[in-house]
């Protein structure tokens, strides 16, 4: 309040290696979201250093951060963040549009990602026509379609039943296995 300075993420030091599955846990207000925003290049640290694949992210401008997000990161949001007027396939294609991929390649990648998460037959449905678990799978497909080196997931199973939660975690583990076979990170 007022002149009080709050350090949301202070004295954090971590190294994450290729193929690792890492969870950031802590009490409410402990800086988890701030930490995730910094890791995801949505924010930069006010002090200290953050390196992603050897790049000093803290010194980058907004355009450079956007390029890093687009090239290296996949996001799975807790609230799905699906666009209601777009169908499932178009929702998965959104980050591929920003990546500058041609329409045919976008469509192919998005369709393949939806098949991987078991939604190949729902490609032309709107998000409102899907269950919560199916919407989460669309969010996962969107993150996977760009074949990112790093996937950041904010409580990806928080609103799901235990069976769907296990399936979602299994999908993420498979992607980690795929990513660790590549020489990108």
Label every model-predicted segment.
Residues 1-182:
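ABC family nucleotide-binding domain
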